[in-house]
Amino acid sequence: MGGEKAFSFIFLLFLCFFLANLSASSAHPPRQKLKQRIPCKQLVLYFHDVVYNGHNKANATASIVGAPQGADLVKLAGENHFGNVVVFDDPITLDNNFHSPPVGRAQGLYVYDKKDTFHSWLSFSFTLNTTMHQGTLIFMGADPILIKNRDITVVGGTGDFFMARGIATIATDSYEGEVYFRLKVDIKLYECW
């Protein structure tokens, strides 16, 4: 009888060890190296945002359309602008010069959505109308403004960019108080039709 108990114990121990290994190996399959994808199209563009401040109506390309209670629609609210909604119709250029000929328009909105730091949520389109590119690209995503380079998604497009998808790396290229900023937008499309 003692031999049977020892055999049963060893068999159960072996079975538990085997099942534990089987479970662990199926829960964590071996990692495969991700295939490095090459963009099918890449563009670098700049858009220039001039926020209306009550004194620059002729040059303003953006306006505050929503503000927290007690704030006005001329000046951005509070320390981190939490609750402000800004719509824009900004020129897009091929270089960082505000006075360069525009190749299109950036149109959409951004919402300052964090109380404790500069952070916004973006939803906008680039409408391009040049000999090189005709069509639109649609962008959406969170923008942690204080980070130098941040990624937002390209969720679609029309014309030359029909059903395009990819990533846009944005960086604040210039910033002049609460009135003007320029974003460098490095667009990498991974789905092109």
UniProtKB/Swiss-Prot annotation:
- Determine the domain of life of the protein's source: Eukaryota
How has the protein been applied in practice? Combinatorially expression of Sinopodophyllum hexandrum (mayapple) genes of the podophyllotoxin pathway (e.g. DIR, PLR, SDH, CYP719A23, OMT3, CYP71CU1, OMT1, 2-ODD, CYP71BE54 and CYP82D61) in Nicotiana benthamiana (tobacco) results in the production of the chemotherapeutic compound etoposide.
Write out the function statement from the record.
Answer: Dirigent proteins impart stereoselectivity on the phenoxy radical-coupling reaction, yielding optically active lignans from two molecules of coniferyl alcohol in the biosynthesis of lignans, flavonolignans, and alkaloids and thus plays a central role in plant secondary metabolism. Also involved in the biosynthesis of etoposide, a chemotherapeutic compound of the topoisomerase inhibitor family.
**What Gene Ontology molecular function terms does this protein carry?**
dirigent protein activity
Where does the UniProt entry say this protein principally localizes?
secreted
Biological process according to GO: phenylpropanoid biosynthetic process; response to jasmonic acid; response to UV; response to wounding
The free-text tissue note of the record is: Expressed in rhizomes, stems, and leaves.
Entry-linked InterPro entries: Allene_oxi_cyc_Dirigent, Dirigent
Reply yes or no: does the keyword Secreted apply: yes
Query: Which pathway is this protein engaged in?
Result: Aromatic compound metabolism; phenylpropanoid biosynthesis
| Alphabetized Gene3D superfamilies for the sequence | Allene oxide cyclase-like
Entry's family note: Belongs to the plant dirigent protein family.
Q: What glycosylation sites does the entry record?
A: 59, 129
The listed locations are: Secreted, Extracellular space, Apoplast
Subunit structure, interactors included: Homodimer.
User: Which Cys pairs does UniProt list as disulfide-bonded?
Assistant: 40-192
The answer on whether this UniProt entry bears the keyword Nucleotide-binding reads no
**Keyword entries, A-Z:** Apoplast, Disulfide bond, Glycoprotein, Secreted, Signal
Give the range the annotation lists for the signal sequence. 1-29
The name of this protein is Dirigent protein
Q: What induces it?
A: Transiently induced after wounding and by jasmonic acid (MeJA). After an exposition to UV-light, first transiently induced before fading out.
Instruction: Identify the species of origin.
Output: Sinopodophyllum hexandrum
One Pfam family hit: Dirigent
Quick one: a GO cellular component term? apoplast
